[in-house]
Amino acid sequence: MTKRFYLIAVALLIFSGADSATPFIPLQGNVTSYRMKTLEGKKISLRDYRGSPLLINFWATWCAPCRKEFPIIKEIEKKFGKDGLVVLAVNVDDTRTISGVKSFVSAHSLKFTIPLDPNRKLFNSFHGTSLPLTLLIDASGNVIRTYSGFLGAWEEDINRELSELVTNASSKKAE
């Protein structure tokens, strides 16, 4: 009985934070020039987006918190996309499930660019350990903030940070 209690207690501790985001100390340095293909087969690099603030979200079709936060990301793109924010929803599913990814994107009317990172090279370059993982990157390519887990708890912070990022990007373009 005691052993069962401890197992349940440990399981509760492990999974209690599974649906919340943890802000990390901003990573140092510039984003990688790693190239990848989009869901449509177009080759892109993060370097292609220099001059624009980015929200990069790593996700998978099997990840419940990832699916849960797409309405938030769609709303963010709707709000800040007109001001230059680019949303990249980087899928880390295995290439064998690409048809499932396409079905998911279609069913959820996701309009932003969906790069594919099936070997998790880009994900690992950002020290990713769990999904979803969201990064805010300034127009110069510097990682400003990293969120691990469901974004709902940090929506207000993200909106404030994105507002600053698009304002700073606009003022730099005007100079």
Model-derived regions: residue spans:
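N-terminal "domain-start" segment that seeds a small globular fold
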Residues: 19-46
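Thiol-/selenol-based redox modules, centered on thioredoxin-like
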Residues: 136-175
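Short, internal strand/loop/helix patches
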Residues: 31, 102-140
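Conserved redox-active cysteine motifs that mediate thiol-disulfide chemistry
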Residues: 50, 58-75
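Short hydrophobic alpha-helix segments
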Residues: 47, 126, 145-147
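Structural microenvironment flanking redox-active thiols in thiol-disulfide oxidoreductases
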Residues: 67-108, 118-125
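Alpha/beta-hydrolase fold active-site loops
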Residues: 53-54, 85, 132, 142
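Sec-dependent N-terminal signal peptides
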Residues: 5-14
